[in-house]
């Protein structure tokens, strides 16, 4: 069923934290959800932003496959530890009021700040690669952890 409503859950990938099965503000695992700047993320018992190290752990301990899932492109991220998986949609980013790179790239915030004019660390993903970079001043996707 396309875009089926699912309950937000935290998936055990065998890592140090559990990862939400959908982006913050989404109603299904393939929806882009909210786009937020680092200082706009306000969470409580729902979870929290992952740290840079937790995002690196996700990169290093999971297999990443670029897929088209019900018309949405992104990565299926499958744990090498227990086989569980999450989908990270290529939601692009927001600059001002305009969306860029939707369906082509994904940008996911972390809670790790760096001493630079740019600020927070983020995961950037495209069909050819994925890795950690310094975030600019744009609004990005948020995937919570517990």
What are these regions (language model features)?
Residues 5-7, 12, 17-48, 52-146:
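C-terminal, surface-exposed recognition/capping segments
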């Amino acid at each position: 069923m396309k875009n089926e409503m699912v309950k937000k859950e935290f998936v055990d990938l065998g890592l140090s934290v559990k990862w939400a099965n959908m982006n913050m503000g989404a109603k299904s695992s393939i929806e882009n959800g909210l786009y937020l700047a680092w200082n706009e993320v306000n969470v409580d018992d729902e979870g929290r932003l992952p740290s840079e190290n937790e995002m690196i752990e996700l990169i290093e301990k999971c297999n990443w496959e670029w897929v088209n899932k019900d018309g949405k492109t992104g990565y299926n991220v499958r744990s090498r530890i227990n086989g569980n998986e999450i989908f990270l949609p290529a939601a692009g980013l927001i600059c001002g009021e305009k969306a860029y790179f939707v369906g082509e790239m994904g940008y996911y915030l972390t809670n790790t700040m760096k001493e630079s004019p740019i600020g927070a660390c983020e995961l950037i993903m495209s069909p050819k690669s994925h890795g950690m970079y310094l975030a600019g001043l744009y609004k990005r996707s948020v995937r919570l952890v517990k």
